[in-house]
């Protein structure tokens, strides 16, 4: 069994008030919460810094935890919730991003089960990249793994770099590119240790907080997601796309 915590920071530079953005009649954070509840999690908690978000979650029958506004990352917000609820060190926590209203419940379950069985401090997921534009897009985080499925590195750069192919053209890519999905599973004790580590140089360069884990010698297990998640919402255009996706599904989530 596992617990899902959904960080729902209210302030957003590109999309202010994002957690409460309406998607087919419900706030986005409620859409994410409903997907998480379908994963089989024993508990789903929304961690936010805004009372309006708390009210929206509770009105929808969910559980919300009010957290500080000064956290620098979703992981720090999770750590506050873990301390408030006094979760045991071995409790499996799945961090589901609050801007993923179309996240498949199956992959939430998948990442929790992978953590339970892989022997790493942290587990996450990835999906194949088939489009060269995505491979060269710095907003699409790439990951490379070793033979046992443990992450070697995450980067905004195109990794691995196909020297011979890319010397000729950037229009086609091979079949070995993976895009990291921002879903994480870890035990509560691991998060308690993580927040005591100083940010690493690589993390600061790439602006990817998971690189802190590799920097300090911990392992991250990466598996291919059982399902490809729908659009995440980071901009107004993303929000329009998410609304269209829900309309196309023609069902209430």
From Swiss-Prot:
The protein's name in its UniProt record: 3-deoxy-manno-octulosonate cytidylyltransferase
Pathway listed: Nucleotide-sugar biosynthesis; CMP-3-deoxy-D-manno-octulosonate biosynthesis; CMP-3-deoxy-D-manno-octulosonate from 3-deoxy-D-manno-octulosonate and CTP: step 1/1; Bacterial outer membrane biogenesis; lipopolysaccharide biosynthesis
UniProt xrefs under InterPro entries: Cytidylyl_trans (IPR003329), KdsB (IPR004528), Nucleotide-diphossugar_trans (IPR029044)
Alphabetical UniProt keywords: Cytoplasm, Lipopolysaccharide biosynthesis, Nucleotidyltransferase, Transferase
Subcellular location: Cytoplasm
Reactions catalysed: 3-deoxy-alpha-D-manno-oct-2-ulosonate + CTP = CMP-3-deoxy-beta-D-manno-octulosonate + diphosphate
A GO MF label: 3-deoxy-manno-octulosonate cytidylyltransferase activity
Thylakoid in keyword set: no
UniProt EC number: 2.7.7.38
Entry-linked CDD domains: CMP-KDO-Synthetase
A GO biological process held by the record: lipopolysaccharide biosynthetic process
A single Gene Ontology CC term: cytosol
Biological role stated in the UniProt entry: Activates KDO (a required 8-carbon sugar) for incorporation into bacterial lipopolysaccharide in Gram-negative bacteria.
Keyword Cytoplasm set for record: yes
Similarity-based family: Belongs to the KdsB family.
Native source organism of the sequence: Proteus mirabilis (strain HI4320)
């Amino acid at each position: 069994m596992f617990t899902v915590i959904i960080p729902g920071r209210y302030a957003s530079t590109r999309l202010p008030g994002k957690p409460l953005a309406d998607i087919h009649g419900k706030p986005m954070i409620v859409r994410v919460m409903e997907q998480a509840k379908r994963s089989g999690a024993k508990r789903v908690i929304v961690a936010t810094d805004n009372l309006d978000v708390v009210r929206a979650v509770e009105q929808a029958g969910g559980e919300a935890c009010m957290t500080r506004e000064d956290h620098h990352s979703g992981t720090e917000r999770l750590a506050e919730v873990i301390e408030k609820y006094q979760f045991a060190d071995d409790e499996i926590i799945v961090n589901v991003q609050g801007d993923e209203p179309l996240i498949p419940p199956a992959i939430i379950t998948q990442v929790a089960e992978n953590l339970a069985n892989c022997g790493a401090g942290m587990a996450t997921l990835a999906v194949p990249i088939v489009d060269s534009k995505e491979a060269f897009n710095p907003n699409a985080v790439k990951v490379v793994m070793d033979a046992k499925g443990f992450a070697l590195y995450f980067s905004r750069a195109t990794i691995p770099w196909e020297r011979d192919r890319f010397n000729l053209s950037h229009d086609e890519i091979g079949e070995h590119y993976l895009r990291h999905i921002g879903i994480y599973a870890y035990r509560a004790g691991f998060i308690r240790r993580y927040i005591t580590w100083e940010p690493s140089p690589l993390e600061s360069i790439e602006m990817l907080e998971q690189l802190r884990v590799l920097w300090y010698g911990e392992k991250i297990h990466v598996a291919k997601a059982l399902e490809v998640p729908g659009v995440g919402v980071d901009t107004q255009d993303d929000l329009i796309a998410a609304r269209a996706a829900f309309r196309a599904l023609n069902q209430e989530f």
